[in-house]
Structure formats: structure tokens, C-alpha cells
Amino acid sequence: MIRNDTMLKGQFVLKKTQIALSAALMGSVLLTGCVTQKSNTESNGPKDTQVSYVEYFADNAVGNPLAIVQHPAAIHKNGITYVSYQGPKEDPFVATYNHSTKEWSGPFKAGTSELGRRDGGKKFDNHGKPTMLIDDEGYVHIFYGGHGGHSSNGKNPLGNTHFGANKHAVSKKPYDITQWEDLDNITPFGTYNQVVKMDNGDIYLFFRHGAHRSDWVYQKSVDNGRTFSSPVSFLKHKRRTDIEAVDSWYAWVGKGEGDNLIVSYDYHVCWDGGAGINGRGHTTERHDVYFMNFNTKTNQWSNVEGESLALPVTKEVADDKTLAMKTGALWTFNGTSHLDNEGHPHIAINAGVDRGAKTGGPKQTRHVWWDGKKWLGGNNIIEGYQGVSRGDFRVTDPSDIRYLVTYEKEGDAVLSWWDSDEDGNAFSEGSTVLRKNNATFAISALIENAHPEAQMLVAEKESDENIKIYLVGEDGPVPRALSNL
């Protein structure tokens, strides 16, 4: 899914001229947010015109417009990077950047989210952010709009409901993001969409089948997303008998080797109202890190040692067979997982001290990995840092791990590279990709099949509307002409 460092360095050399130009332009942008460039054109108008550039490609995002869990949010294919984010009314918006012509197209609205048109609840629900796929025929797919589905959709057979409806939009033409249509072929009871296309073209859509107290499932398509099979549960929610709570989960699914998918996840103790620590009731309390494999050819699930697992996996089985790390009193927020060149899994997990808030407290990104015999790691990427951090990573050799992490520094939002040549035990900060005053960043997972110029999407949050979205690469953001916004 993510190109290795050799391919990235090769592409970086080919694009050296453009990156140098972008860097020159951005010298002014970093101070002012806008840069002016003179250009000579073969037109009937003035020979010298001034073009103003900005670092962002869109400024109409709302709420929390990006997250790592809904992935991929962007894909690079045939020299074009396709990007998506949550725009006005929580609708999905899609744009493209052509790396050869340096031209942006869009953003275009890809669908209509029920979350932005619901009665009651918070101003922004934020759970229906778009997830993207490009099928073997070139059609662009967007999955969006659900926070478990609504009771008006009927009874959820695999859990409970909340708001919205999980939807599936597809472009009307291959590789064309200007026109879209909805396909009524997935259950409305969904949220946290994650989609993977296998080498043979089969599509696997993973999501939680409802609100907090629901199973995690997948639906499979063998016809480029035109139809999907019924949901199959792979993580089980169930009532606990020892405390006033329900077993629940948060998962991240990615491409493994060959026909395999890899799944990392953490456990959510879903307390009843008035129960739990200090009677806080339902909070975001989560703990521990788990890992398992899914062989899509044989339909067999297994743990890291190859031991078979029966579906759906329960808390008891997960603790016994798939546990990668106990986090103790630390609360978690799940991250991503990838394989190194030896086929060993590496997991990003965010964990922090419970400070009594509804969300516990700030969580810091940590690295956990399997060395072929045992699970190791758990150290902070940013040693000594106690604020909020989030990130995704590439790993080639077990001793060559590279994270792109956002964190707070001196009141600024920072996105920078962090590198480890010590098997993930310690990391050092490299170049800063983006830094903004008096803001926070929300980020996507690393872009699928990423181009060196376009590695990740970043939302600059100063308020909850008119949020700027950036496409950032190895050395900074891809600029866009202000007149083209």
C-alpha cells in the first residue's frame, strides 16, 4: 500500500525541480500563508501577471474533517493524487492533484450525509468522514455518512444505533470526480469505514456495525463494488457480567502480504450511564493492543503465531490469543499497523494517563512490534512529551522506521518526521513538514501508494468551520493558486 523508501527516493529525484520550486514559493508562504509569483503567458492579455499561491487546497472543511481510522482518505494512481475530506453539512468532498501538470481539480461534493441534517446532538457528529477506493475499472468509490445508523433504518441485528446512515457513492465515469451517484448496496448500520482492494480486485469494506455496542464486520465485493455480500462479524460485542459495561472495540485494517489482511485493535469498556470510574458513565476508556491476520483466500483468521481463530473473536479469546501489549492504567486510542520486510507486524498505538476527563487525558503515539518470537516496544515516539500526538508510519527493515507525527510545540501545531534505527526503541526528529500558530492539526493515515510530494492530508483547526486542508509531502505542502480555489 505504501511505497518503500527506495521507490520514494527514486521518485523524489525525478521531482526534484518541482520540489525546489515549491520550497522557494513556500519561503513566503510560511510567513504569510500566501505567495505571489510572476508568470509570462502566450495570451492576448498582459505578459506579466501575478499569481498568488496558498499552501492549502481547500478551505471549506468542518468539524473534525480528517482522521487516521477512516482510511484511505487519499490515493495516488497514474500520477494523480485523489483526496477526500469532510466538508459542509458533513458531506464528502473530493479533489485531485496532477503531479505532472501541477493542476488541482475540485473539490466536488460526492454525496449527501444524513449526519449533517440530523435533529439534535452536537453541531458536528464527525463519524462519517469519507473513505476512498479506486476499483480495477478506475471508478472512484467513497464510503461515508454513518455513526451507526438511525433507528429509522430499522433494527440493527448486530448492535445498537445512533445517527446517520452508512452510504456508498461512486463516480459516474472512471477517474472522474465531477459527477457521483449513490449505490444502495451496503448496510446503513456502519461507521469508521476502512476499505482494502486485494491484488485480484476483490474489495473488503470493514466497519463497526452500529454505535458503541456493536460488532465489527466486513462486507466483500467481487464485482468492483457494484454488489456486496452480507456483513460478517469478526469482533464481538457482548454484555459483561462482572461490571456494568459492554465489551466493545476499535479496529484498524490494512493490507498484509499476498492474500492477507492485518488487523490491530484496542478494547473499549463501554460503561453504563452512572457506572465506571468515579461514576463517569460512558467515556472513551480503552485499553491494550491486539493483533490478528485474515487470509482472504482461505477465509481463515489467525493470531501472529498462526494459531486459528474462530469468529467472531470475543474479549476472552482476544486476551488469550491476540494480545500484543497490556497498557495497564493507561487509556488508549488505536492507530495503524504495517508489516516490515520480514513480514513482522508493527503497530502504532496512542496511550496516556487518565486525568479524569471524559476522554481520559492526552495520549501519545507509541510503537509496538513483533520480532518473530515476542512483542516488544511501547515507548513514546516523542520522548518525554505529555501532550496529544498522532501519526502514521512506514517500516522497511525492522531497524528502519519512519513516522509522520503531529504534536504541539510552543503553542504551535507541528507535523514532522521522526526516524528510528533502533528497532523502534527510540526516535529522533527530522524535518518539519508543516507548522502553524495557534492551531491544532487533524491528519489522515499515510496516503495509499503515496507520491513523494503527497504523503498525508492535514486539517488546520482554528475553529470548527472554514477549515483549511493541506496535501503535504516529504518537504511540505503542495501549493494551489488562490484564484483556483
Curated annotation (Swiss-Prot):
Enzyme Commission numbers on file: 4.2.2.-
Segment forming the signal sequence: 1-33
Subcellular location: Cell membrane
pH-dependent activity: Optimum pH is 7.5.
Keywords, in A-Z order: Cell membrane, Lipoprotein, Lyase, Membrane, Metal-binding, Palmitate, Signal, Zinc
Top-rank taxon, per record: Bacteria
Temperature dependence of activity: Optimum temperature is 45 degrees Celsius.
UniProt main location, coarse: membrane
Positions of S-diacylglycerol cysteine lipidation: 34
Entry GO MF terms: lyase activity; metal ion binding
Entry similarity comment: Belongs to the polysaccharide lyase 25 family.
Chain's role: Ulvan lyase involved in ulvan degradation. Ulvan is the main polysaccharide component of the Ulvales (green seaweed) cell wall. It is composed of disaccharide building blocks comprising 3-sulfated rhamnose (Rha3S) linked to D-glucuronic acid (GlcA), L-iduronic acid (IduA), or D-xylose (Xyl). Ulvan lyase catalyzes the endolytic cleavage of the glycosidic bond between Rha3S and the uronic acids GlcA or IduA, producing oligosaccharides that have unsaturated 4-deoxy-L-threo-hex-4-enopyranosiduronic acid (deltaUA) at the non-reducing end.
Name of the protein in question: Ulvan lyase
